Amino acid sequence: MDIRAAEISAILKEQIKNFGKEAEVSEVGQVLSVGDGIARVYGLDNVQAGEMVEFPGGIRGMALNLESDNVGVVIFGADRDIKEGDVVKRTGAIVDVPVGPELLGRVVDALGNPIDGKGPIKAKERRRVDVKAPGIIPRKSVHEPMSTGLKAIDALIPVGRGQRELVIGDRQTGKTAIILDTFLNQKPIHDNGPDKDKLYCVYVAVGQKRSTVAQFVKVLEERGALEYSIVVAATASDPAPMQYLAPFAGCAMGEYFRDNGQHALIGYDDLSKQAVAYRQMSLLLRRPPGREAYPGDVFYLHSRLLERAAKLNDENGAGSLTALPVIETQGNDVSAFIPTNVISITDGQIFLETNLFYQGIRPAVNVGLSVSRVGSSAQIKAMKQVAGSIKGELAQYREMAAFAQFGSDLDAATQRLLNRGARLTELLKQPQFSPLKTEEQVAVIYAGVNGYLDKLAVNQVGKFEEGLLASLRTEHKDVLEGIRNEKALTDDLKAKLKAAIDAFAKSFA
């Protein structure tokens, strides 16, 4: 066998080139014990808090407890495949997720991996899940409306862009339905509104049944709302660390829009289950328990998440992230630990009540207990003009209704108040999946507060509203357009609206 000289020089060059290459050093540790989704790892001396580590078979985990002789790692996946003595590698990266418009229309898990079978996500950017909230200087006070399409909320408990409004109530009172209707209400703006008004939606399902999440996605898809929405799902069968992480992952995805001068809305459904998952992790990591066995930093868990919802000022792009966290109460007890925590963090709350729900008042909003701490600065002027008196009238009505149960002989003024209140309550009812545009709400509420419903039987109010809206949408488009463009009820518009309602009321009778 003969080797040519040229070949020898090529081989020597290759050898010389590869000589002295340093071996790659990666820091590894060893699993001491594993169980209940927690691994104790020996080694990994330089690991960072919150760093992603990798177990054999590609299972990932996150270092949470950094102790003197071992590291407590929570496992994002099944712990069955990890055994004592397994080698654990550092990745050097803090937990992050893909973000950007590529995620719109997709369903992902808490680590941003697609779970909808529509192929991989080619995101151009990744972000850390747990970042610091914007400070005081980059923010601006909330002043633009974030319309939900629900009369009871937009008129009485208005939510602004950049606000955090808690949705709180017992199970099966329609909490998720409020978030779903709000998402669906953004469709007209996405279809033919200006880009600067578009609101991208993120839904985070924590500890929900898979069937519930599938139903939610199906409704969004059928109604064409999935194209501007992202769904992050950590269902009941997912490990606790995934349920803990999902809200932070969803928030990072929403922040991408906020920081790029766009607007996003995120619904956390629900934070009670995130707190339970966090409690489970903390107790298994042997952190000391506090009230109701929650760890001492469970308040910080929710406050650092919800503080990231903000309205940024013009120098920072004027984007916003609005949060609608959900809390499930047990037996209407809003003074339990987690509900009081989240009430104190948010800028107002929407209380949903079981007995209202069963009385057929849906959405089952308790108007007396619900507040928006941003208030009317998150409403257009037209809505302020018509809805100003309605809250007071309803408060008087509730007081009188409780009182009137005892006495039969009521004077005319009280009778009038009770009649008006019953009709306004009826007017605020709304079927699911039928959000109304703001200008339509203004017209309907104008009819309610100006006595057009007083002569009708209570069971006719719904029909009157449907008929009035149909008439306005076909014969009086100019009135609705006027309210939409002017954002206020000028004398001219008021006269036109009054004439339109008068004409319809005559034909309805």
UniProtKB/Swiss-Prot annotation:
<dbReference type="InterPro" id="IPR023366">
    <property type="entry name" value="ATP_synth_asu-like_sf"/>
</dbReference>
<keyword id="KW-0472">Membrane</keyword>
<dbReference type="InterPro" id="IPR004100">
    <property type="entry name" value="ATPase_F1/V1/A1_a/bsu_N"/>
</dbReference>
<dbReference type="GO" id="GO:0045259">
    <property type="term" value="C:proton-transporting ATP synthase complex"/>
</dbReference>
<dbReference type="InterPro" id="IPR033732">
    <property type="entry name" value="ATP_synth_F1_a_nt-bd_dom"/>
</dbReference>
<keyword id="KW-1278">Translocase</keyword>
<dbReference type="GO" id="GO:0005524">
    <property type="term" value="F:ATP binding"/>
</dbReference>
<dbReference type="Pfam" id="PF00006">
    <property type="entry name" value="ATP-synt_ab"/>
</dbReference>
<dbReference type="GO" id="GO:0046933">
    <property type="term" value="F:proton-transporting ATP synthase activity, rotational mechanism"/>
</dbReference>
<comment type="function">
    <text>Produces ATP from ADP in the presence of a proton gradient across the membrane. The alpha chain is a regulatory subunit.</text>
</comment>
<feature type="site" description="Required for activity">
    <location>
        <position position="370"/>
    </location>
</feature>
<dbReference type="GO" id="GO:0043531">
    <property type="term" value="F:ADP binding"/>
</dbReference>
<dbReference type="InterPro" id="IPR038376">
    <property type="entry name" value="ATP_synth_asu_C_sf"/>
</dbReference>
<keyword id="KW-0997">Cell inner membrane</keyword>
<keyword id="KW-1003">Cell membrane</keyword>
<comment type="subunit">
    <text>F-type ATPases have 2 components, CF(1) - the catalytic core - and CF(0) - the membrane proton channel. CF(1) has five subunits: alpha(3), beta(3), gamma(1), delta(1), epsilon(1). CF(0) has three main subunits: a(1), b(2) and c(9-12). The alpha and beta chains form an alternating ring which encloses part of the gamma chain. CF(1) is attached to CF(0) by a central stalk formed by the gamma and epsilon chains, while a peripheral stalk is formed by the delta and b chains.</text>
</comment>
<dbReference type="InterPro" id="IPR005294">
    <property type="entry name" value="ATP_synth_F1_asu"/>
</dbReference>
<keyword id="KW-0406">Ion transport</keyword>
<dbReference type="InterPro" id="IPR020003">
    <property type="entry name" value="ATPase_a/bsu_AS"/>
</dbReference>
<dbReference type="InterPro" id="IPR000194">
    <property type="entry name" value="ATPase_F1/V1/A1_a/bsu_nucl-bd"/>
</dbReference>
<dbReference type="GO" id="GO:0005886">
    <property type="term" value="C:plasma membrane"/>
</dbReference>
<dbReference type="Pfam" id="PF02874">
    <property type="entry name" value="ATP-synt_ab_N"/>
</dbReference>
<keyword id="KW-0139">CF(1)</keyword>
<dbReference type="InterPro" id="IPR036121">
    <property type="entry name" value="ATPase_F1/V1/A1_a/bsu_N_sf"/>
</dbReference>
<comment type="similarity">
    <text>Belongs to the ATPase alpha/beta chains family.</text>
</comment>
<keyword id="KW-0066">ATP synthesis</keyword>
<keyword id="KW-0813">Transport</keyword>
<keyword id="KW-0067">ATP-binding</keyword>
<dbReference type="InterPro" id="IPR000793">
    <property type="entry name" value="ATP_synth_asu_C"/>
</dbReference>
<dbReference type="InterPro" id="IPR027417">
    <property type="entry name" value="P-loop_NTPase"/>
</dbReference>
<protein>
    <recommendedName>
        <fullName>ATP synthase subunit alpha</fullName>
        <ecNumber>7.1.2.2</ecNumber>
    </recommendedName>
</protein>
<feature type="binding site">
    <location>
        <begin position="169"/>
        <end position="176"/>
    </location>
    <ligand>
        <name>ATP</name>
    </ligand>
</feature>
<dbReference type="Pfam" id="PF00306">
    <property type="entry name" value="ATP-synt_ab_C"/>
</dbReference>
<keyword id="KW-0547">Nucleotide-binding</keyword>
<keyword id="KW-0375">Hydrogen ion transport</keyword>
